[in-house]
């Protein structure tokens, strides 16, 4: 893609998200969502093939439907209260429709079906943007309207997302689909705690973006898109095999890695609110995610694909400069659990 066009598209994507995040007027929020959606579609179609076109079309239809529901909720609320302000969402029907629209944009169950299909059909770089940056705008609006959200509806969607994110990834061999199901599960954890402690949702989001970005960068460095290609990683870049192992386990939420921090804090916060059954279900379903990450870990570092002797020295010709950006990301996504008690005290 032409660098000038790519720069324009990226600027529009960023601008659309920032408009949503900084607006207190529903019409501006809707405009920001539309700008963001229309700008990211060419990024999804960077590779000119039928699969990427199909993925972009699915993304467009889903996001357009969500935008229609969002505008319907805004108009219902306007008829009820006469207000365009985001904080003035008092109509229960409008609140319910708004929650459906935003969860559809996020990819929460039962509106999650588009996430694995779209992620699988696009390049790794576009998948990274889709699963990280594109979550910021809907989560910001959910954060803003959290006092007026139907608690039962959101918790049901969240628990379903955690369970589906775990079950869906079990049989997958495509790394992009696995990351998509992981995203669904992480969104479930974030929206569960949104009602009780919105600040913790933001902390969870930052950690999720760090871990997901690190994982996608590792996949792009080793050109891996399937579990089979992960077994070739030790030939190409043996130095990052151990790093990949730690990052995968961190993404699965295994202590003492960074990924355990949000789960620990969320379970503790729910328990403080005398909610015992909910964190128990969440902790059990989180084991499903950990299981398929353990499978990836096994494929990455504990198996060796049959190769010739010439293949075994291929890593010597790789350019180590590409790994320079990965270093701080790896440290942050695996080794930031120790400050957790201090964060809990400050919170």
Swiss-Prot record:
GO terms for cellular component: mitochondrial inner membrane. Disulfide bonds: none annotated. Its EC number is 7.1.1.2. Keywords: Electron transport, Membrane, Mitochondrion, Mitochondrion inner membrane, NAD, Respiratory chain, Translocase, Transmembrane, Transmembrane helix, Transport, Ubiquinone. The keyword 4Fe-4S does not apply. GO terms for biological process: mitochondrial electron transport, NADH to ubiquinone; mitochondrial respiratory chain complex I assembly. InterPro entries: Complex_I_Subunit_2 (IPR050175), NADH_DH_su2_C (IPR010933), NADH_UbQ_OxRdtase_chain2 (IPR003917), ND/Mrp_TM (IPR001750). Belongs to the complex I subunit 2 family. It is a multi-pass membrane protein. The chain crosses the membrane at residues 13-33, 59-79, 96-116, 122-142, 149-169, 178-198, 200-220, 240-260, 276-296, 325-345. It is an enzyme of class 7 (translocase). GO terms for molecular function: NADH dehydrogenase (ubiquinone) activity. It comes from Molossus ater (Black mastiff bat). It holds the Pfam family Proton_antipo_M. It catalyses: a ubiquinone + NADH + 5 H(+)(in) = a ubiquinol + NAD(+) + 4 H(+)(out). Its main location: mitochondrion. Core subunit of the mitochondrial membrane respiratory chain NADH dehydrogenase (Complex I) which catalyzes electron transfer from NADH through the respiratory chain, using ubiquinone as an electron acceptor. Essential for the catalytic activity and assembly of complex I. This is NADH-ubiquinone oxidoreductase chain 2. It is found in: Mitochondrion inner membrane. Core subunit of respiratory chain NADH dehydrogenase (Complex I) which is composed of 45 different subunits. Interacts with TMEM242. The keyword NAD applies.
